[in-house]
Amino acid sequence: MANILDIQRPIIFDESIAHYELHAHQPYASSTLNNNDEVRITIQNQNLCILPSKSALHILGKFTKSDNSAVAATTNLVNMGIGHMIKEFRLLMNGVEVDRSSNVGITSLMKGYVSFSPNQLSALENAGWVMEDNVKLTNAAGSFDLLIPLNILSGFAEDYLKVLMNVQLEIVLTISNSDINAYVQQAAGAEEVKLTLQKIEWIVPYVTLSDKEKIQALNYITSDPAISINFRTWELYEYPLLPATSKHIWAVKTSTQLEKPRYVILGFQTARKNDARKNASRFDHCTLRNVKLFLNSQSYPYGDLNLDINDNQYALLYSMYTDFQSTYYNKEAEPLLTKQKFLQEAPLCVIDCSKQNEAIKSGPVDIRLEFESTNQFPQNTTAYCLIIHDRIVEYNPISSTVRKLT
C-alpha cells in the first residue's frame, strides 16, 4: 500500500539498450542437410553482445512423396516432427561444449508436455508443436516453414537470460539417419514419402548497449573476471527394450554431486519407434502401477502410488504432472493437458527430487529407477528417463577461457 503514497517518485525511462536487431547465421557453405549430416552454425565475431535465450532455429523444407508430388491427406507431420529429425543438439562456447541434448524429438516433447501452458499453443504452432490431428504444418505443395526457439531445445537457452559478451558461440546439429519418426501415415499401404530440409539458419539477437552501460560493462570485463552461468540441463537416457516382466529395476547412471538430479521424468513408448503407422510423439501408460526413484538410499516419492489405470485410478500421477510448473518455474501451474488428454497422449511420471537430505550431499550419487505395472510390459516397449540437473559454467571474456564445474 505504501506505493500509492509515493507521489515524489520520478519518471524513469529504460534506455540502457540502444539497439536490438536479429541476425541470421547460416551453416558453413559446404554443409549439406541430408540424413546423418552434421550441421555447424557459428557466430564468428566475438566482439558482440548476443542474447542466446531469445535466439531461434529457422528451418524450411518440403514433405512430399518420393516423386515430389503432394502427400495424401492421411499423412501428416507429428508433434515436433522436425525434432525427431535431429539426433543430437550441442551448444559450444569458445569451442567448449556447455550443453547437449540427445534424441531431440523425445527430449523436447517430454520437457514441453510438462512445461507448456494452453495459452502458448498458438505461438508454439509456429515452432512445429501441434497436438491436434487436423492441424497441418505444410501447405498443399508440402512446404513448411518453422521457427523453433532455442529454449525449447536447450536448458541453457531457457534458464540463462542474460547477454554473452566476447564469446564465440556455436551450435552443432546431427541429423537423424531416418525421418520415419517425423510423420504418421493413417492409411493402409501408404505411399513412400520423404522429408527434405532445404534451409537451416540460426536467428540471434544482437544487443547494442547505451554509452553508459557500455562503459560500465567494459570496465567490468577489463580485469577478465570469471563470469558464472548457472542453468538446468536436460539429459535423456533410453532403455531400448524392456523385458516382458511386470517389475523392473533400471540403474540409470552415477552422477557427481553438482549434477545430481533435481527432476526426473519417466515415459514409455510401445512399438512407436520406426513405424510410420504409429505416432512417435505420443507416450503409453503401460498400465503403470508404481514408480520409485532412488538417489543412493533416498527414495522419491516417499509412499507408493498404487495406481490402477484400468480402473481410472491415476489422480496421483496427474497431480505429479501438474505440480511441476509451480516448483520448476515458481509460478501458478497451468498444465497443458487435461486429465483425459494426459492419459491419452503423454502419461509421464514426473518426480520432484529437488529437496534432498544430508545423506546424498556428499560423494557420487547412484540414480536408480524401480517401476512396476499391473500387467507385463508389452513387447517392444522403450523406457525414457529425462534427468534435469544443475550445471555451472564459468567463462572469462578477455582470455576466452570456458570451463564446466563438476
Language model regions located:
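Short, low-complexity Pro/Thr/Gly
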Residues: 1-406
